[in-house]
Amino acid sequence: MTTTRRGVLAGGLAALASTSSPAIIKAKAQPSAPRTLKAVMHADLRVLDPIWTTANITAYHGAMIYDTLFGLDSDYKPQPQMVSKWGISDDKLTYTFELRDGLKFSDGAAVTAADCVASVRRWAARSGSGQSMMRRVKDTPVVDDKTFRIVLTEPYGLVIDSLSTISTSLCFMVRKKDAETDPNQQVRETIGSGPFLYNREETRPGNRHVYDRNPNYVPRAEPPSGMSGGKVVKLDRVTFENIADEQTALSALQAGEIDFYEVPPQDLVDDLKKDPKLTVQVLNKTGHVALMRLNHLHPPFNNPDARRAMLYLTKQEDVMGAIFGQSKSWQACGSYFACGTPMTNDENTEWFKHGQDIAKAKELFQKAGYDGKPVVVLQATDHYLANPAGLFAAQWLRQAGLNVDLAAMDWGALLTRRAVKKPPAEGGWNTFSTTVTGITFSDPISFTGQAANGEKGWFGWPSNELQETLRDKWAMAPTLDERKAIAREMQKNGWDYVPHVVLGQFFRNSAWRKNVTGVLGMPEVVPFWNMEKTA
């Protein structure tokens, strides 16, 4: 029998009606202004620096106010964005980039090559693809105000792919003085050269974030395509409204009080599709992978046997069923990469084929020397995935005989706490859950969660020399078949040292009012340029 969120989340989320029809209270309509689009996103925006965090909501914020040198089009091919023209030397060691005319920051200063070099270097310190690229970079000289170079020590075919990555953190261009901030410290300023301006005066953190059209932004001449082409803003204002209660958000959407709802309750999608005033679609065709990250710095998950225990303890059907109900929008996946992608394989997946085995998990926890100390599970009560995932993680761990401290908080607080390296009893953590887009999860270079470079890496901080060797080998492989073979090696090793466990793969729907058009689908980011709204 499939577990539904109505059972497991009783008291954890607003009560929803039966799946026959959504329980949407008719609210007194207060439609938003014709050229203002009000959106409810998957989480509240708490961190404003899209390099410091990989949180998607912060990447959305970044895409509003910053721009990138290159952008992926709708076919996931890199295209110049802030760059006017570029070239590569015959020996494939020197890349030269020239910026477009008319690029300005919102403080009025021109965007210069020096700004871009500093931005690339700060981004590379936090990005998996950036770190891989910079290991092969000899120098990044500024030629003039509009021109700079990247000089390599050896040919590396992923330079342009890296600069155009859609995976968080994206390579956003900021002012040189902001880019010189320690990458492990947050930039507090929000001065960018993107299509929108962040309106701090009217923003109310925890309630609403306000973005106004940037009148000085010069879009490219090409049609918009994904993160590339002309980012033409057809609205005066976009607001991110923080409405944590799903039923309230649904009521507001149907009443026209909000215009766009990124992640409505997924078990009610079939009913929402029947509403003639709404458009309901999957915007990210690559889907998402849900995962539970394990902290390798502290017991019990500093022991590989305890991490392997989680493979046997996890039951993907529980989490996916709680979110999607009877919907067919998800699948169980045992691959170290997103299922259905070129890197998918079944190497070292006996645990997945076997299914949940609590007895086996208990045995592995005992072998790991579990000492009875509480396992701190971070649960974001306002996040569609991190809420049920936290509840189930606590349930599974208790079934295996472990003591659990279920730490409830909002998503913004979780994003801050997951960066804490102190022991769990001192404000740290043992597990948290999140989502990664399929296109990112299948790329061991772009996804920083595939890195195993210890405390320099992503939250959880796994360390595994073989994984790092295989990632480099994958990046340098000249053919797809060679990369597939290396991916099998990587998966065999990955499910031995276990940086995280997979909670399922899914395709989530978004909903918006019929009078909103021009919505562009893209992994990792929801583009708000090109959107129009009629009365």
Positions of predicted regions on the chain:
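Long beta-strand-rich cores associated with HINT superfamily self-processing modules
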Residues: 512-535
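Ligand-site clamp/hinge motif
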Residues: 219-271, 403
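Structural transition elements
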Residues: 196, 330-367, 383-388
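Ligand/substrate-recognition segments at binding pockets and active sites
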Residues: 205-207, 245-246, 264, 330, ...
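N-terminal lobe/hinge region of extracytoplasmic solute-binding protein
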Residues: 40-90, 121, 191
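Periplasmic-binding protein-like
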Residues: 297, 301-341, 388-389, 494-502
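Extracytoplasmic/peripheral linker and loop segments enriched in polar/acidic and small residues
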Residues: 352-355, 405-416, 445-514, 535
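Surface-exposed binding/hinge segments that line
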Residues: 98, 132-180, 184-202
